[in-house]
Regions:
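Alpha-helical structural segments
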Residues: 1, 18-41, 58-65, 76, ...
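Short helix-capping/turn signature of helix-turn-helix
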Residues: 1, 13, 79-83, 130
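Short, surface-exposed loop/turn segments at secondary-structure junctions
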Residues: 43-53, 118, 145-147
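Amphipathic alpha-helical packing segments from all-alpha helical-bundle domains
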Residues: 50, 87-115, 122-126, 154-164
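Amphipathic C-terminal alpha-helical segment
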Residues: 66, 109, 129-147, 162-175
Length: 201
């Protein structure tokens, strides 16, 4: 016993809904931190096609790793509708550091890098997010929850390949993307994205 009564937390919040929103926001913040850490480990100048591809891959990988390693926090982060849009504490940069904000920033960089055509940018974050989130749910509590780790890693690589193909600016570029053939999935995704940009002209 630590002398804390069950309803002590409510003293700091107006009601149960406000408390739940704060808990969900904190969980979403943990996910955002994991994604930001993955991006921070990627070198290269802003707008460099290879570096931009690596950053997008790092975001997706961090998302899946967090869902796998912190299933309780991951579920809590999405416990409320529209939770992805709720406030996450600022880091002093003024940037949107939410998971959705980081994905949008990575896609914007792909436009700057010449990999993703501007006319294809609007709204593309949602099908990409849906794809990665869907795999996270299938692997966490769905029919893929008991598959061997090696199989799951392969499915993750195929998911990234599918996303890369969705970013192709022309049908001819689709043939160059086979992320699963690379020994390093980050590097393979980056190579694929650079190739897509080269074939988009």
């Amino acid at each position: 016993m630590v002398g804390v009564v069950p309803n002590a937390a409510y003293r700091h919040f107006a009601d149960r809904d406000e408390l739940l929103a704060a808990v969900c926001s904190a969980a979403m913040g943990e996910l955002a931190d994991r994604m930001a850490a993955g991006v921070a480990r990627v070198g290269g100048a802003y707008g460099d096609p290879a570096a931009a591809g690596l950053r997008l891959a790092a975001i997706g990988t961090a998302y899946l790793e967090f869902a796998r390693e912190e299933p309780g926090l991951f579920a809590t982060a999405f416990a409320l509708p529209q939770q992805h849009a709720y406030g996450i504490p600022e880091d002093g940069t003024g940037r949107d550091r939410s998971p959705l904000g980081q994905l949008r920033a990575a896609l914007d960089e792909l436009v700057v890098a010449g990999v993703l055509r501007p006319e294809r940018r609007d709204g593309i974050e949602y099908p990409i997010w849906s794809t990665v989130h869907g795999l996270a749910m299938l692997a966490g509590s769905g029919p893929l929850r008991d598959v061997p780790d090696a199989t799951l890693r392969r499915l993750e690589e195929l998911t990234f390949a599918f996303i890369s193909e969705s970013l192709a600016a022309s049908p001819q570029a689709l043939r160059v993307v086979r992320v699963g053939l690379g020994s390093n999935k980050y590097f393979a995704v980056a190579q694929a994205l650079v190739a897509l940009g080269a074939h988009s002209g």
